[in-house]
A protein has these predicted regions:
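Active-site loop-helix segments enriched in His/Asp/Glu that coordinate
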Residues: 1-85, 99, 106-112
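His/Asp/Glu-enriched, well-ordered alpha-helical/loop segment
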Residues: 175-232
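Electropositive phosphate-/nucleotide-binding environments in soluble metabolic enzymes
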Residues: 10-14, 69-72, 103, 160-167, ...
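Residue-level detector of anion-binding/catalytic polar loops
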Residues: 26, 147, 226
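Active-site core of metal-dependent hydrolases
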Residues: 66, 81-194, 202-203
Length: 232
């Protein structure tokens, strides 16, 4: 889930994943959403992962005006929920972190990893091509064992002039020595995309485009990336 954990529910996400499976599309979900405590199906991210086959991790939002500031202690608690849930199921439980535009960046993440470096491999920072700063923060996370997730639907037209084009962000990460296994790309497909005016007020709402994933994959190849690397 995203901003709306009130009128939208994790059970609806699970139902959609099950319907996609019936149509032949492999699907998994992450429990939780922007708010803390996390909206869940069974009362915790840990038990959601342990008891529900399709749940592979959790979600949280940091550095975003739509959530209260997240402390290192809160991040440690939520990441540990995902970790232990995965241990009970026999895989690595992941925590996807929505990264907003606030100036603190991933400071709470780095503070948490100072105390619990073993959690690094459970963390995915998403929307990191929203700005050069977010990208650099994600690169630091990768150095601590985490993953960077580039949003294929974010570009100058959809977010603003500081946005890194997804295919270019992937190429930049690889030039900087980020292992391709640590670089992800997702569409955020059909997720709400608010447009803001200069005064910070919401001027409109859109939805992230599923087709952007294919577009940026094709651009990676057109811009010189070997097909085998783009597919990874």
């Amino acid at each position: 889930l995203g901003t709306d954990g009130v009128t939208r529910h994790v059970d609806a996400v699970l139902a959609k994943a099950n319907s996609l499976e019936e149509e032949g599309v492999s699907s998994f979900i992450m429990s939780g959403g922007y708010p803390v405590p996390s909206p869940t199906l069974t009362g915790s991210i840990r038990s959601d992962i342990a008891f529900i086959e399709k749940v592979r991790g959790g979600k949280i939002a940091i550095a975003d005006h739509r959530v209260a500031p997240v402390s290192a202690e809160t991040l440690l608690a939520v990441a540990t929920e995902a970790r232990i849930g995965g241990m009970l199921r026999g895989f690595i439980g992941m925590l996807i972190m929505h990264i907003g535009a606030a100036a603190e960046g991933l400071s709470c993440v780095f503070a948490a990893l100072e105390r619990a470096p073993h959690l690094g491999r459970h963390l995915i920072a998403t929307h990191i091509n929203r700005s050069p700063f977010a990208f650099s923060e994600a690169a630091k996370l990768v150095a601590k064992g985490g993953f960077m997730d580039i949003s294929s639907g974010l570009n100058v037209q959809t977010l603003g002039p500081d946005t890194l084009k997804p295919s270019e962000a992937i190429a930049l990460a690889m030039r900087q020595g980020v292992a391709k296994e640590r670089i992800l790309m997702s569409s955020d497909g059909n997720g709400s995309a608010a447009r803001y005016g200069d005064d910070g007020s919401v001027s409109g709402l859109g939805a992230s485009d599923l087709g952007s994933l294919h577009t940026e994959f094709a651009d990676c190849v057109k811009e010189g990336m070997p097909l085998s690397e783009a597919l990874c």
